[in-house]
Amino acid sequence: MATPRGQTVWFGNEFPNDDLKDLFRRLHQHSKDRRFRLLSVFLDESTAILKEEVANLPQQLQELVPHFDTACTLPEVDFRQGPLGAAMESALLTILELGMLIGNYEAEDIEWDLDPSQTILAGLSIGIIAGAAVALSSSLADVAKVGAESVRVSFRLGVYVADISTKLEAPQSDGTLQSWAHVVTGMSHEAVQEELSQFNAVTQNPEITKVFVSAADKTSVSVTGPPSRIKAAFQHSPSLRYSKSLPLPVYDGLCHAPHLYSQDDIEIVINSAKSVIPTSRPVRLPLISSQTGKPFEAKTAGELFLEIGTELLTGTIYLDNVTAGILEHVKLKEPTGNYQIISFRMSQVLNGIQAAIETDFPALGRARRDLVSWVHGDYGARRPSSYAASKLAIVGMACRLPGGANDPELFWELLEQGRDTLTTVPPDRFDLNTHYDPTGKTENATQTPFGNFIDRPGYFDAGFFNMSPREAEQTDPMHRLALVTAYEAMEMAGLVPGRTPSTRPNRIGTFYGQASDDWRELNASQNISTYAVPGGERAFANGRINYFFKFSGPSYNIDTACSSGLAAVQAACSALWAGEADTVIAGGLNIITDPDNYAGLGNGHFLSKTGQCKVWDKDADGYCRADGIGSVVIKRLEDAEADNDNILAVVLGARTNHSAEAVSITHPHAGAQKANYRQVLHQAGVNPLDVSYVELHGTGTQAGDAVESESVSDVFAPSMPRRRPDQRLYLGAVKSNIGHGEAAAGIASLLKALLVYQKNMIPKHIGIKTEINPIIPKDLDRRHVGLAMSNTPWPRPAGKKRLAVVNSFGAHGGNTTVLLEDAPERVKVSTQDDRTTHPVVISAKSKKSLQANIEKLLSWLDQNPDADLADLSYTLCARRMHHSMRFGAAASDIAALQKTLRSWLDSPKASTELRAIPNDAPSVVLTFTGQGAYYSGMGRELFAEFSYFRTQVLQLDQIAQRLGFPSVVPVIDGSIDDGPASPILTQLSVVVLEIALARFWSHLGIRISAVVGHSLGEYAAFAVAGVISAADALYLVGRRAQLTEERCTQGSHSMLSVRASEDDIEELIAGSPDTAEIAYEVCCRNTPQDTVIGGTKESIDRIRQALEANSIKCTQLDVPFAFHTAQMDPILDSLETLATPIAFKAPSIPVLSPLLGSVVFDRKSIHAQYLRRATREAVDFVAAIEAAQDFGLVDAKTIWIDVGPHPICAGLVRGIDSSASVISSCRRNEDNLATMSKSLVTLHLAGLTPCWAEYFRPREREYSLLKLPTYSWNETDYWIPYIGTWTLDKALLKYGEKKAPLSLAMSRPSALRTSLVHQITAETVEATTATLHVLSDMQHPDFLEALHGHRMNNCGVATSSIWSDMAFTVGEYLYRRLVPQVKDVHMNLSDFEVLHAQVALEKKGSVQPLVLKAHLDLSTSSMSLTWFNASAETGECAAESFATGVVRFEDPAAWTREWDRLSHLVLGRIEALEQRAAEGKASKLSKPLAYALFKNVVDYADRYRGMDQVVLHEHEAVAEVTLVAERHGTWHTPPHWIDSVSHLAGLVMNGSDASNTRDYFYVTPGCSSFRLLNPLKAGGKYRSYVRMFPLLEEANMYAGDVYILQGEQIVGMVGQIRFRRVPRLLMDRFFSPAAASHAEKQLQETAPSATSVKKSTPPAAEAPASVPALLSNPVAIPFPAASKSEVSTPPLTPPSQQESPGESAVITPATSDRGDPVDAGVVGQCLQVMARETGLEVDALTPDASFVQLGIDSLMSLVLSEKFRAELGIEIKSSLFLECPTIGEMTAWLEEYC
């Protein structure tokens, strides 16, 4: 159709028939897109005008208007109701029509086409006001501005009309709307007027309330007046009563009433408020009056609005006149042209006008343009007009949730399987046996035992997060797991800080919800330490994340009770919408440990006493508490798409409000919840019926379920309009599965919703255990809404997006709601990937983690054999944070990668030789090759793949061409054949390639430390170093090549590479008569054994023959000229002349000069004459490299990058230094990208992390971010158990009661009780693991008797046989708990270690508790054991264990096979000993004599004296043993029996004449294993044999195996029992009651810990007596590797610290991993203090370890400074830890100044 020659724009007085709410929602949505900037401006201006007008209303009217952020949300309420109905309707109609017009132009991208000569505007009633805005505009931007004034006038007119009209007739009391106008058809205007006049006269109707005609045309008449008067008029007049009439939707008053309004009224409406536009603004387009049918005569805006106001208030509408006016406009145009009507849908009036046009102008072409239909169009991804207009993308998530849901996939498995994670409170939280009272009579006790708990809450990788063990232990576990899940969520998101603009660290913020402080208030408060505040205060939860990752965006910790987690997400979203951050990490945190909170919530009737949250169940009786940690990563959607992220779901809106009107602060309120839903829906412009899934808050309380079911159903599934059957709304409640995570509840709900999107399934609801709660609305099914009672598919409709809502409500009254939709459908770009080789890098912060990461990846590859190697490379390189322990490879396919990974894992050297990258990145030197490496296509793949490299080449090529030289691009991209080329092309292409390569390396993030060029390569090196410009370099190279071609003869001279030194060549040539006179020149000294010589071709050929005759390898160089020889003389003057005008500058990068044999830093060394000399003189590459070494610019770690077509210089560097690290940029006959991949991996492994983002940028849209396994944490358990019952005891204080001292006799009965094991305090049994904590009192009569059966220095000292019996007792108990059907349990007590022996207290009636902790894992068939002293007051464990061991559950058949192979050897030695005794060569000792010798060190009680006779020779002995018949207590294996069969080794060491027993005594620090084939029998007869020998690797230490025999069979063995030689003068110190506590205190302050995990300890003065592990019992505990101390000399305590000889402490020097003692001077003492205070081993304090890596922060620096002063008398400032950032620098300072 031809272009219209005329057009009418029609502004009607009625809304289109479309869903009005939907129209405004869509307007709102489009306004957020920057493609609709003017629409957004118009709506913002209109909203502002309306807010201003509402604010000017009387208070009672203001209160009728709901809050609105945009006028587009006002239609969501019934705006026609109330006194402001007319005003709202008028304003909204104006907004809709103008908004639709503006949006139409922007959507279709139409130029402003309303030409005044071709266009006329027309409309009715309020529509004319909208038309006025267009009439006053000359552009679309004008409409957006002027339109706001039209909105103002419309609103004011409506307010005024309603105000006047209500004075004429009051509204209906029930709110029913009544029409003020009826339309009559079939009667003429005159007939209707006559009937009305008669009615008004007869009824004496006052003038102001009369019924009158407001509009008329040929077929209809509008009758207007007060509703009751209209009704009366129709009843009065039979003609009217029986006419065809209909009420019009005019509900708010009278217009078109000249008898009612005057000019003053019009002035009040139009001019009483300041116009938003100048009143003088000219009228641009004709606007037809609905009264006259002619254009308004007004010339300005002020006049126009007055005329319109006059017409609307006092004028009658004559539609015939309007039609005539439009027909007149049509008539003036081409009668046979085209005419267009532009309107907002069609109406009856418009149909009539169009019919009139068709009748009068039948030949006229007609067109229609609808201004509404565009709003339903899809214009692709939104381009937000502002931050606030953005949708948000959730791109990563991680969790630790109950039931082992330690990652999202495990969480989904739990949901999909419908599992319930309910359990009772684990013993590691608190003891239910003491803290649970269902009757509620015990104060501070919980009335419910139930909860939902995460696995291993204390486990944490402290080293990864640069925290010392001491700091980690004091840090709240939820803070630790916030760090961990934040990292894992970032891993899933592929978030590498700084990779993209949206991930800059200063634009990343953290928001976490937390509502309790259990750890700070309970666990950590048992021993408040340095890290109490940063470890426990809430703000540090997310502050620590910001600090560790160096995020400087906002950091908020939010407490809104149960909704804290989702409120934190909402706050994070608000920060994104406000532009305060570009990426946020948000979540919720809850770890339960404190029974006080259980008691408080129970007493507040929040908690269920019967178990899990029973959401919507009729028996719902409260919620069940739960742990939970969750983190999500959120960005703006456009940023996520730009960053190539995987989008889990999109956030459309999020809001929080408060239930202010609830009946109590903790009671929910349906009205507040509904208001919040509507705010979120309004924010997003979403129809609530389009939401198909709601994740309920759903706590399972009667009040909560009732209120939420009401609010959700009323908003999302109202009775009217009702959902269609295909619009079913599904509901879910995750608390039915995992309980109520309180501060983490909201984030758990969000994670579930995200998984529902990912899995396209709604998991079944398991909360209804009996039947649905009758308080739930009964008609839900009719409304098509309900819980998903089975796993329900939730497919994504084609081309559409699913909407979901997540609720979370706080007990304090807060309501948070988040609205989600599907991620945009992503179509992966599919093109041919030219990269045949891909880099793959994996990293970790520890060797263990790296190995596990590789194993995880291998497993993932096995499960995903179709994985794309390119995607894997992209994910691991560009989308991962990289750490210090690294693996890397370049692979061509998945199979090759798998082979490489397995090979690395299988290699014994892989782990032992693995080293962390250095803290300081190695230096990088670029070596620029000469022209000898030229070939066509030498940069082909790089040129094709990388736009940056290509741009550099093209720019340099353009310079070269402008200098008059040929293009080098064909050489680089390989578009010319490889073959001979001119020197100009050859040399220019090499230099262009090298400059481009150097810049490309910098582009990839490689920082260059120095450059060196070889021959021609020097020009490229100078350009890269900034000595000369790139243009100058190309000019000089090109002109030099031209001069060479012009003045030198090709082929007359040649160059020869000789594998020999310059001196060797000279000697060989001069020494032969045939060659002595031949002239040649040295061109290059490449390496000490690689020299290039040059000369005439004839001379060089003869020399080559002579050298090869002497077996010297020679290679003829393929060059046309002999550079650096006399052949270059003809060009030297001209070259110098050409270079003289060039500006030579000081290098920005040091230049290694082969000419000068030095490093150039200044601007004077390189000049025109330098280039002359460099052309003529030899290239001394060796001298350049050696100069760099002398200057310290390069070292053994330096990386040398060969920048050239082929790695020639790399080979030269290796020839000079065989250990040098060299890599290539390009390599002949190898794909550039394969070469680059290998080189980048090498750089990465060396500690130079490339900018992987740039490497992958060219094809990023083709790659997908893979969901790979998460990081493998190197975890340690940092759990501080709550000891005792003090949360209960404090309740007694108000009664004046005090807690009695710890007494095991008062404790409840225990399931396991023996003479040594007295009370189980904690027990957890799962499928394959079990944990047990037992409490024992060494003052218990049986225990005390066992101690006094082994006396040293008149003290009862615990023998290792005591610990052996405890180990076997606990081991068999736990094993049978897991494997109840087992018949016999065979145990090997192995790796037994001890730090401090236990000495019995002498004070009668005292308590001396100890704690044994055991953890059995069936997967390893082992059980770990740790013994602790405990406080006599509280039962709290000491800071460090005094003994550890491992019980291994083994096959006795294997023992028998082992011992059978050895028995003949043992029996042979026994026979030899007995023969020696018979010969008088060995001592034969009776029982009294043997134990008399033993008494030299230890005095055994009678029951321990089982050896009947002993044959002893030097350090070898055999004993006949008879066990006493009595067990003397309840044991697994009585300690006195164990000692009897094994303490022969102690007699050998302390009774043999081969030992120096006068000056020393010998004690055992332990053994490697202890096994008994069968239980020892009362009265049983055995033989023991042992041979002790000195350990060469450890001075003063002896070891041996004790064999236990019955008859000829070995039935037991103590493997590698060790004895240490100790000066006898220390006997009193270690084994006396008075000194025991003092020695313990001293050793706790100086000795290294047996474990890096230090537990809280009571004050030292209250510690139980214990001494170092210097025991004589045969089965004791060896020192750990870090504590192989030899106490053979008096203490090395500084005199200033010695109080008296009798009180001097023994300082046990720690040893390094090589077994060498750590320096016992100041440095050693300082290291000991540092190890003790941080909880680290001394071995960890290596010289290269940094304080940051060790977790020594500013707070710990202050502590250490104070400890150095107080204990060592050393005054240092805490700032020293900043000035000396590593251990090595610190120790160097101490050695220098202390």
From Swiss-Prot:
Annotated region described as N-terminal acylcarrier protein transacylase domain (SAT), given as residue ranges: 19-256
InterPro entries with a match to the protein in the record: Ac_transferase_dom_sf (IPR001227), ACP-like_sf (IPR036736), Acyl_transferase_dom (IPR014043), Acyl_Trfase/lysoPLipase (IPR016035), Ketoacyl_synth_AS (IPR018201), Ketoacyl_synth_C (IPR014031), Ketoacyl_synth_N (IPR014030), Malonyl_transacylase_ACP-bd (IPR016036)
The enzyme's E.C. designation: 2.3.1.-
Residue ranges constituting the PKS/mFAS DH domain according to the UniProt record: 1318-1628
Source organism, top-level taxon: Eukaryota
Active site (catalytic residues): 562, 697, 740, 1350, 1539
Sorted UniProt keywords: Acyltransferase, Multifunctional enzyme, Phosphopantetheine, Phosphoprotein, Transferase
Record comment regarding domains: Multidomain protein; including a starter unit:ACP transacylase (SAT) that selects the starter unit; a ketosynthase (KS) that catalyzes repeated decarboxylative condensation to elongate the polyketide backbone; a malonyl-CoA:ACP transacylase (MAT) that selects and transfers the extender unit malonyl-CoA; a product template (PT) domain that controls the immediate cyclization regioselectivity of the reactive polyketide backbone; and an acyl-carrier protein (ACP) that serves as the tether of the growing and completed polyketide via its phosphopantetheinyl arm.
Protein name: Non-reducing polyketide synthase nscA
Species of provenance: Neosartorya fischeri (strain ATCC 1020 / DSM 3700 / CBS 544.65 / FGSC A1164 / JCM 1740 / NRRL 181 / WB 181) (Aspergillus fischerianus)
Lineage of the organism: Eukaryota, Fungi, Dikarya, Ascomycota, Pezizomycotina
Name of the gene encoding the protein in the UniProt record: nscA
